[in-house]
């Protein structure tokens, strides 16, 4: 029975995220299933401003920090073998993978 799987990838490292997307696309092409994606989602930006001076006296100067979270979605209509390969996939620690089956 053919199922459809949605793979949602999130990472702060864009190169590792694109590498995992490439591996998933290769798995889909080798097994001959229909693949849709990787679709880039908007980048989430987390901004934090901290004060440079620890004592609180002097001019107010701030350091600004930003973390960007890159996201991708891949839709696969797959059989059991392909889904098992996706579950057994070894991914870097920086990449978070969510797999939704429908």
Curated annotation (Swiss-Prot):
Phosphoprotein listed as a keyword: no
Superkingdom assignment: Archaea
GO cellular component, one term: small ribosomal subunit
Keywords: Ribonucleoprotein, Ribosomal protein
Gene3D superfamilies: Ribosomal protein S10 domain
The UniProt record lists the keyword Ribonucleoprotein: yes
InterPro entries xrefs: Ribosomal_uS10, Ribosomal_uS10_dom, Ribosomal_uS10_dom_sf, Ribosomal_uS10_euk/arc
GO biological process per UniProt: translation
GO molecular function terms noted in the UniProt entry: structural constituent of ribosome; tRNA binding
Family: Belongs to the universal ribosomal protein uS10 family.
Description of how the protein assembles with itself and partners: Part of the 30S ribosomal subunit.
Role, per record: Involved in the binding of tRNA to the ribosomes.
Matching NCBIfam families: uS10_euk_arch
Name of protein: Small ribosomal subunit protein uS10
Lineage, uppermost ranks: Archaea, Nitrososphaerota, Candidatus Cenarchaeales, Candidatus Cenarchaeaceae, Candidatus Cenarchaeum
């Amino acid at each position: 029975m053919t199922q459809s799987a949605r793979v949602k990838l999130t990472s702060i490292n864009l190169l590792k995220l694109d590498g995992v997307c490439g591996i998933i696309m290769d798995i889909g092409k080798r097994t001959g299933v229909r693949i849709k994606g990787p679709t880039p989602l908007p980048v989430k930006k987390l901004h934090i401003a901290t004060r440079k001076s620890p004592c609180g006296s002097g001019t107010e100067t701030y350091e600004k920090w930003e973390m960007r979270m890159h996201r991708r979605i891949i839709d696969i209509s797959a059989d059991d073998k392909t889904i098992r390969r996706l579950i057994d996939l070894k991914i870097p620690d920086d990449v978070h993978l969510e797999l939704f089956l429908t």
